Design a protein with these regions (language model features):
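Intrinsic low-complexity, intrinsically disordered or marginally ordered coil/linker segments
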Residues: 1-119
Length: 119
């Protein structure tokens, strides 16, 4: 079962631009293993649009999802920079420092920063 959760991609974000993101906790029903994943896209007008897409996908795999909060990601692939900032009106502010740690594992050669700035 452990490998199934490991198979879920930790990060799925747009390759370029500024867009909303959410931090989602996956958990096996009844506790047990859990992990946090980052999802973000320009296609989402609101943070809950991202959650409404990821939640059924994860439920199919047998996980419960909880949104830990949201914010924005500014992804500059040319300069290899990612900035995490802002918050979600509906879900509150994600712990951006957690998000950055997850992003650093995927984008190893990037400069990744975060702040509580709104813009």
């Amino acid at each position: 079962a452990g490998s199934a959760m490991a198979a879920v991609r930790a990060v799925e974000i747009d390759p370029e631009g500024t867009f909303k993101y959410i931090l989602v906790r996956l958990q096996r029903p009844g506790g047990g293993e859990q992990r946090d994943i980052v999802r973000g896209t320009k296609a989402a007008e609101f943070h809950n649009h991202i959650f409404e897409k990821v939640n059924p996908e994860m439920e199919k795999l047998g996980y419960e999802c909880k949104c830990l909060g949201g914010g924005k990601i500014e992804h500059n692939s040319k300069d290899k920079k990612i900035r995490v900032f802002g918050l979600s009106t509906g879900y509150g502010k994600a712990d951006h420092s957690v998000t950055v740690e997850i992003l650093k594992k995927e984008y190893t050669d990037y400069e990744i920063t975060w702040s509580d700035d709104k813009k």
